[in-house]
Structures are given as structure tokens and as C-alpha cells.
Amino acid sequence: MGIVFLRNGSPYVYEAIKTVQYTPFRKWADRGEGGHYVVRRLREADRTLTSQAVKKLRQAGAKFQGKPYDSSFEWSDKRIYCSELVWKIYDRGLGIRVGELQKVRALDLSDPIVKTKMKERYGNKVLLEETVISPGEMFSSDLLVTVIQK
């Protein structure tokens, strides 16, 4: 997950992977399972995403450039995970909250794969009251529409 910005006329995905960085869109898309990817954009983007608005989004995002990836999903600015990056850029840049923040406790943690991953990351000290934004929560936001699906 990331946010697409044009750089010198070419699309790049600003994303949190090892660090927060720009990835050429094609390289990002090629990482999709079986080449699958989806691009969603704000509804009425032609009206909402003016050049001034995009400038504000870039400025909000610049504060995260180079920050390390947050594999423990803490709600802070020291380290950043993918959906947290995009959520904070929209919130801080334009005051738009794409998706509802949740507590870890509200997520479905019953899947065996999720349980194993949680145990690896947190041991027996899962921070159930930690604020999070999940990619699924953002993806399903009514504020977004699908513009590309491959």
C-alpha cells in the first residue's frame, strides 16, 4: 500500500517497506501477487486534489521520508507501517481520514497465521489498546473509488 505521486512526469508509489521511500509504479505493481494490483483514489479527485492539495500531501509525506518500517504497528512517527503512512498523509495534509482508526482488540486475531505472527512480534504482550489503521479498513473506505484494477 502506498500513495501515488508524479515525479518528473512519471508515477511513483510513496510507501513504507524497509524505509519510507518512492518506488517506481511499475516496480511496485510487479510485486503484486500474480501481477494483481488495485489503484483507488479519492472520490471527486478532480475537484479535491488540486495542485495546492497535492503540495500539502507531499509536504505531509516528506516528514516520513527515510523512516524505518514499523513491523510492530505502533501508532507513532518513529517508525511507520504502510497503511499508517497513507492515513497520516491524508489526515495531516488535507484533514481527510480515509478509514476509521481502530484498536488492535477490534481486529480479527483468530486466524492461525495472524496468531503466529502476533506471537512472533509481541510474545505474550500484545498491545490490544494500540491504535491501528488496517489496509482493509482504508481500502473499503467510502471516500475512495477504484480507478485501476489489474
Give residue ranges: language-model regions.
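Cysteine-nucleophile amide-bond enzymes
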Residues: M1-K150
